[in-house]
């Protein structure tokens, strides 16, 4: 096997938000990851940061439950803060309606599965002095990983938005480009095979759940903060439930955002309605109100 020197490893490819969807999808398929520049505007970055600051100040670092796999992957100086639908109006109004996020999710999931929804959204904050996270694949959290073959469709994608600069010295996410295509399920990468996903605030790294990755060591004096949004086919149970979101908040969301958090009936790729109430569509049976004309934060990808 040929060993590639770390200084000769290719960087993650980057495109503008206005790049054609087919170009984005091609890079995602070939490399397992693609950086989209200016995924959200800096004004939105600032609003999200201000909305989550008080919650993060109260949030403890380290694993927030006793799962063994989380003990191994969440460092003692890293905060994972969920509940963003209630904590951040900007998240539920703007990010959950992001046209590029939906265009990519549609491209990945629609033909094989039908509708998709949110698996989990969380702010990940890596503090100064945090060690590098162990390399992992997000889809290894789920039992169905054992039944996948090299020809299986992708089952989850992560849209990781930089809320601060991502630099190698402050713990930028490290990627093993191409590892989503490895046929040997026992193969595990070394740190020397990783490259940092360096980004400006507002950029996003989009990567497949089958790609090896992990947060880098934060050698700087500042925290590194990002917003992770994973989507997957609605056939799968999300990691985070939104059953406790007050109806007053739900009814001030768009139909698309409502469906993303499990408050609407979804359909399979054959048009079969799922997640129904009293044999009817959830939104009809609950007489659910919604905002029908969302403010789009960017033009949809072509």
UniProtKB/Swiss-Prot annotation:
Cofactor (UniProt): Fe cation
Keyword terms: Dioxygenase, Iron, Metal-binding, Oxidoreductase, Peroxisome
Keyword Flavoprotein: no
InterPro entries: Phytyl_CoA_dOase-like (IPR008775)
Binding residues for Fe cation: 136, 138, 213
Transmembrane segments: none
Annotated EC: 1.14.11.-
BP term (GO), one: terpenoid biosynthetic process
Top-tier EC class: oxidoreductase
UniProt key word Ribonucleoprotein: no
A Pfam family it matches: PhyH
Pathways per UniProt: Secondary metabolite biosynthesis; terpenoid biosynthesis
Annotated knockout phenotype: Abolishes the production of 15-deoxyoxalicine B and accumulates decaturin C and 5-deoxyoxalicine A.
One cellular component term from this protein's GO annotations in UniProt: peroxisomal matrix
Function: Dioxygenase; part of the gene cluster that mediates the biosynthesis of 15-deoxyoxalicine B. The first step of the pathway is the synthesis of nicotinyl-CoA from nicotinic acid by the nicotinic acid-CoA ligase olcI. Nicotinyl-CoA is then a substrate of polyketide synthase olcA to produce 4-hydroxy-6-(3-pyridinyl)-2H-pyran-2-one (HPPO) which is further prenylated by the polyprenyl transferase olcH to yield geranylgeranyl-HPPO. Geranylgeranyl pyrophosphate is provided by the cluster-specific geranylgeranyl pyrophosphate synthase olcC.
Subunit structure: Homodimer.
Name of this protein: Dioxygenase olcK
